Amino acid sequence: MRVVLQKVNHAAVSIDDEVVGKIGLGYFLLVGFAPDDTEEKLNYLVHKITNLRVFEDENGKMNKGLRDVNGAILSVSQFTLYADTKHGNRPGFSQAASPEIAEPLYDLFNQKLAATGIPVETGHFGAMMKIDLENDGPTTIIYER
């Protein structure tokens, strides 16, 4: 499982020019799955992400988490995180989980994030989406489990 987390001032995801998810201050997540991903991996990453402290405190130190700043999460599925670019000029995606495996994991991941009490918005699994966001920092963290 791979997650690219970006700290944002705001983010929105649109499908066919219709906004389907948006947040203010928080984390924008790109989420990808491998065929062998498990609920245990989901639980680990949910804990890491929801307890991450990358928002500045009164001393300018990265010491506050999402709950401290009343932040939210925008989660978007992204199988291309498993792109293989070792050969040729076109990426291969054989290392990514099939939609039959990835979609239930993505849904469960988002449910577990929301169960922590942090507001969660999502894109639509498998859809062509447009993302509009404003990075803060920028701060980008890559999780792999």
Swiss-Prot record:
GO biological process: D-amino acid catabolic process
Gene3D superfamilies per the UniProt record, alphabetical: D-tyrosyl-tRNA(Tyr) deacylase (3.50.80.10)
UniProt key word Cytoplasm: yes
Presence of keyword Hydrolase: yes
Subcellular location: Cytoplasm
Entry-linked Pfam families: Tyr_Deacylase
GO cellular component: cytoplasm
Main enzyme class: hydrolase
Predominant place of localization: cytoplasm
Renumbered ranges of motif Gly-cisPro motif, important for rejection of L-amino acids: 137-138
Enzyme nomenclature, EC number: 3.1.1.96
Family of the protein in this entry: Belongs to the DTD family.
Assembly: Homodimer.
Functional note: An aminoacyl-tRNA editing enzyme that deacylates mischarged D-aminoacyl-tRNAs. Also deacylates mischarged glycyl-tRNA(Ala), protecting cells against glycine mischarging by AlaRS. Acts via tRNA-based rather than protein-based catalysis; rejects L-amino acids rather than detecting D-amino acids in the active site. By recycling D-aminoacyl-tRNA to D-amino acids and free tRNA molecules, this enzyme counteracts the toxicity associated with the formation of D-aminoacyl-tRNA entities in vivo and helps enforce protein L-homochirality.
Record remark on domains: A Gly-cisPro motif from one monomer fits into the active site of the other monomer to allow specific chiral rejection of L-amino acids.
Record-given protein name: D-aminoacyl-tRNA deacylase
Organism, as annotated: Limosilactobacillus reuteri (strain DSM 20016)
Lineage: Bacteria, Bacillati, Bacillota, Bacilli, Lactobacillales
